[in-house]
Amino acid sequence: MSQHLPLVAAQPGIWMAEKLSELPSAWSVAHYVELTGEVDAPLLARAVVAGLAQADTLRMRFTEDNGEVWQWVDDALIFELPEIIDLRTNIDPHGTAQALMQADLQQDLRVDSGKPLVFHQLIQVADNRWYWYQRYHHLLVDGFSFPAITRQIANIYCALLRGEQTPASPFTPFADVVEEYQQYRESEAWQRDAAFWAEQRRQLPPPASLSPAPLAGRSASADILRLKLEFTDGEFRQLATQLSGVQRTDLALALAAFWLGRLCNRMDYAAGFIFMRRLGSAALTATGPVLNVLPLGIHIAAQETLPELATRLAAQLKKMRRHQRYDAEQIVRDSGRAAGDEPLFGPVLNIKVFDYQLDIPGVQAQTHTLATGPVNDLELALFPDEHGDLSIEILANKQHYDEPTLIQHAERLKMLIAQFAADPALLCGDVDIMLPGEYAQLAQINATQVEIPETTLSALVAEQAAKTPDAPALADARYQFSYREMREQVVALANLLREHGVKPGDSVAVALPRSVFLTLALHAIVEAGAAWLPLDTGYPDDRLKMMLEDARPSLLITTDDQLPRFADVPDLTNLCYNAPLTPQGSAPLQLSQPHHTAYIIFTSGSTGRPKGVMVGQTAIVNRLLWMQNHYPLTGEDVVAQKTPCSFDVSVWEFFWPFIAGAKLVMAEPEAHRDPLAMQQFFAEYGVTTTHFVPSMLAAFVASLTPQTARQNCATLKQVFCSGEALPADLCREWQQLTGAPLHNLYGPTEAAVDVSWYPAFGEELAQVRGSSVPIGYPVWNTGLRILDAMMHPVPPGVAGDLYLTGIQLAQGYLGRPDLTASRFIADPFVPGERMYRTGDVARWLDNGAVEYLGRSDDQLKIRGQRIELGEIDRVMQALPDVEQAVTHACVINQAAATGGDARQLVGYLVSQSGLPLDTSALQAQLRETLPPHMAPVVLLQLPQLPLSANGKLDRKALPLPELKAQTPGRAPKAGSETIIAAAFASLLGCDVQDADADFFALGGHSLLAMKLAAQLSRQFARQVTPGQVMVASTVAKLATIIDGEEDSSRRMGFETILPLREGNGPTLFCFHPASGFAWQFSVLSRYLDPLWSIIGIQSPRPHGPMQTATNLDEVCEAHLATLLEQQPHGPYYLLGYSLGGTLAQGIAARLRARGEQVAFLGLLDTWPPETQNWQEKEANGLDPEVLAEINREREAFLAAQQGSTSTELFTTIEGNYADAVRLLTTAHSVPFDGKATLFVAERTLQEGMSPERAWSPWIAELDIYRQDCAHVDIISPGAFEKIGPIIRATLNR
């Protein structure tokens, strides 16, 4: 056996990426060479064998030993002659050849699959036409060496044709590359490169993407779109000729970088650039993968020209080439992150200048790429040719892009080249990226001009009251008024306001609880010609005082009990109002004018002081008239007033019903926070129209069951949402429960409530592809503009800043002309008009609607858990003596950065007093407030937070915490505990002196658990599994298992009972799916209250119930006996996934037959056996979906060691799946007379399958929660972000 070598250069990243991926062949590279001419196929086959033998990396074998990976050249390996296939008589030779090659690429070709890592075929498709198919694993070759091997084989073939000897190998042994690489790691050059890239990393702008989907650190896909662009019309050649002082490669790069920047709407972004990493190195003539993708900061200035950008980028690359040997993964690790963190860069750029041509006499050769490895986002390969033309190959991740979008992007690139060719001195900021017709398309969307009457709110209401004087108008729990009676009250109160000195143009503050008197007060203020200023009495006194000081209202309307809160506000006249007035028979005042301010609403300000937004009468009149036209109310409608009056959505609730003859009913104060109270309110008053903010709609939906939805929501005809992004899944759940049409509205406080609309039900909802419903189309007399950083309109599909124009814009900020001027700017497209910048990011969709993409935030995911860093920051800032606080996710020790997501949350605190903080006590407080996955594992006190040059927080400069020895409890005992503590310390980078130290609490994670198990297996000369580490994660517990009886310890985690968590309260029993294992249910511990115990019930092999039973009833009976041993009497709480749900339902029925109480039955995408054709599945063997589940199980529980353990585990899983299919062929359901909670995986739901119909014969009552995921993902941490809280809430009830 030859020398064992470590993985170097690109190999470690490829190895780890494949290990962490479920993709079967993503790391294979393949192409075929189309040979046209006379080919001696047997001779070429001999040349292939000879050529492959000359490249030692093609004979590499790989082995994993104690968590380390080694490679060695298998000198005994002899390549077989490639198969020669003749398809000339086939009906479609080309299509058949393509199918053969794709079939090879669809296999499991992972490095440990047992399949050949090198494969060639010679396929004849015509008399003088051959396809020479070549496929390699990426661990063996890269994009430089792949064609080099092909050329050498062609050279050998030509020599054999001439009767000459086989040419000598031109390839350097890869051992030389490894040795050189290891020497580099110990050299001063390494130190210089590390310093260079540390500085580059600090200056690097964020990555960008052409896709609206967020960039993930590790989301590569082998499902790739390929688009080849040929710029052979002479325009690139013309441009290059005019710019003769610029290299064509530099010009091509600048064009691509500029094009990407404009389509991303980012003038500063990070791209990846592929470096050969070969010049001046042994790797120059080696065949292993050494290409390096390094981050390139792209900075585009509006006032520079394309040649200036090209020259600057060329200078950057020249400097980077001196440091190109430094691994990209090491740059990430140096910054305290793991390779799966947020990516360093987005699109990858590659200039391909190496030769793909083959010189074979009498034969033309053309290479066709089939697979180049996975793509994270987008890759651009630039091919400037010797004729002066340019071709570009685009590779795009299909999860993020579709072909029509890419083709449209390509058209914009052609247009850019044409513009620069016509004027090489054109400034980057003056380039137009809109295609012909797109300006007209946007103009059509914004053609919203509708003539409205010159009127006011009070005039509109008075007009309607005259039409329907005796119709019911306004009611709460104590009072009811007709339209006539309401107008009498309004006029009486308006006269009273006049008596208190209120004049037209004044403002009047209102601090009233929700009741009819609040509505009457607002109408009376408008009647008197003033503007209302709503005060939320739930606000702190200081905030209310600030608002009153800024607004200086002429009067405050409030109640006796609230009056003392305003006693120290100077010069404030007040009126207490809480009872009907005696009508005086006075004539209407109607003193408002269209130019008057209608209302003032305060919003939070960046300075910490709220700012008042003034909205005019004409603006809100336009909004209400549009709404009545678009969603007409009648005298039969009942509108709910439940929105707090300080939220501008309340405006249409207070006035819209009264311009349409409808009735407004007032919810009780604070009722809007109580979903059950709102259900009763809707049912009692027969509400037809209401509003929810999406978060409250989610809470309301969670409170509904199909029965209560029918009972309490039957009268709802139209429901509106605004205030937050509206999740599409929530809309689907609402539609399923109630059927009431849902409408999404959007608008900032600065623009009369709402400026756009979109249906969130029916066909429009079905067509939504994003996670949230679009904000839609503009309302009457309103324009939506999406502009880039240079104030140019962006084309459809491109993200930009959202601006608003038109009649509904607010008048400005109260007393803040400077702020008004900065936010309400001149419209550059319509002279004399204003435009408001919302601060929201959006894009146009193909249907002309606007999609909201969000604002900048601090959201991230760590090992499947979504985390808002800002939420943690706010909790930390509330801690005693903390002046500033920020949370950061980073890798605390480099041992954890070897693969997977090794990040931990670190809290950085600045003391207000300057004295040392008791971080241990503060950490304990955080644990009481935050869920475990959001509590920082370390708190670090800093004298001040690091700031960047522009004064913003510099997260990259936050120091990594040093792991120090924790305060010891009981010291580890000599022997096993000491060995285990030392293993913890070596892997986690900290001193472990406590026998109760927990591996995961110290920063360990599942991937490190594999390494720990391998290390302990070696030290104790017996098998220790990752499962044992997971269920016994402290030093003492793990020592007890290892020192115990060998077979039982070996099987820890593989027994019938799997204790997932111990608590002092009730137990949730979780039944295994078809795999036989219940380990997946460990995710529940993140969501259930600590008092709950969680126990998994499994079917191990051999002798498990699934293997020994003849039918499913016997499995149920066996598990029932196990359950009764654990808990003889109820109440019982049962949960099952897939087959486990079938078992849980059958056991629940048997428990009820015994007279026991089943308090909870949860089913995760479970269906009665009667709904599936299991006989057909058994006859046909395991289908692809079942095999996909087997692989998912295998990946989830794969042991650290190669060999018997993982093989045994996989055999167990596969055997249990086969038994499951066998048992289900004869299974029948047993009726359960209780209630069940069913979670449905929508993406894999069979067409026409109704959960209600499927389960109605077998379950008495069913609550259904639909999830946007596939069957195999419903148990995943991501899916449980929604499922976990629902289960928690249901169990707590």
UniProtKB/Swiss-Prot annotation:
Record's cofactor remark:
Binds 1 phosphopantetheine covalently.
Q: Which SMART domains match?
A: PKS_PP (SM00823), PKS_TE (SM00824)
Region feature (Adenylation): 482-887
Q: Per the entry, which co-factors are needed?
A: pantetheine 4'-phosphate
What's a GO cellular component annotated to this UniProt protein?
A: enterobactin synthetase complex
Any GO BP = enterobactin biosynthetic process
Q: Name one GO molecular function term.
A: 2,3-dihydroxybenzoate-serine ligase activity
Q: Tell me where in or outside the cell this protein is found.
A: Cytoplasm
What post-translational events are described? 4'-phosphopantetheine is transferred from CoA to a specific serine of apo-EntF by EntD. Holo-EntF so formed is then acylated with seryl-AMP.
Region (Elongation/condensation), start-end ranges: 1-301
Query: Could you tell me the keywords of this UniProt record?
Result: ATP-binding, Cytoplasm, Enterobactin biosynthesis, Ligase, Multifunctional enzyme, Nucleotide-binding, Phosphopantetheine, Phosphoprotein, Transferase
Which top-level group of life is the source organism from?
Bacteria
Pathway assignment reads: Siderophore biosynthesis; enterobactin biosynthesis
* Modification O-(pantetheine 4'-phosphoryl)serine, positions: 1006
Domain called Carrier: residue spans? 971-1046
Q: Which residues form the active site?
A: 1271 (proton acceptor)
Name the reaction it catalyses. 3 2,3-dihydroxybenzoate + 3 L-serine + 6 ATP = enterobactin + 6 AMP + 6 diphosphate + 4 H(+); holo-[peptidyl-carrier protein] + L-serine + ATP = L-seryl-[peptidyl-carrier protein] + AMP + diphosphate
Please list where the region (Thioesterase) is annotated.
Answer: 1066-1293
Transmembrane stretches, by residue range? none
Q: Tell me one Pfam family matched here.
A: Thioesterase
This entry's Enzyme Commission designation comes to 6.3.2.14, 6.2.1.72
Q: What does this protein do?
A: Involved in the biosynthesis of the siderophore enterobactin (enterochelin), which is a macrocyclic trimeric lactone of N-(2,3-dihydroxybenzoyl)-serine. EntF catalyzes the activation of L-serine via ATP-dependent PPi exchange reaction to form seryladenylate. Activated L-serine is loaded onto the peptidyl carrier domain via a thioester linkage to the phosphopanthetheine moiety, forming seryl-S-Ppant-EntF.
Please report which protein family the annotation says this sequence is part of: Belongs to the ATP-dependent AMP-binding enzyme family. EntF subfamily.
Q: How does it assemble?
A: Proteins EntB, EntD, EntE and EntF are the component of the enterobactin synthase. Components probably do not form a stable complex. EntF acts as a catalytic monomer.
UniProt-recorded name of the protein? Enterobactin synthase component F
**Origin organism lineage:** Bacteria, Pseudomonadati, Pseudomonadota, Gammaproteobacteria, Enterobacterales
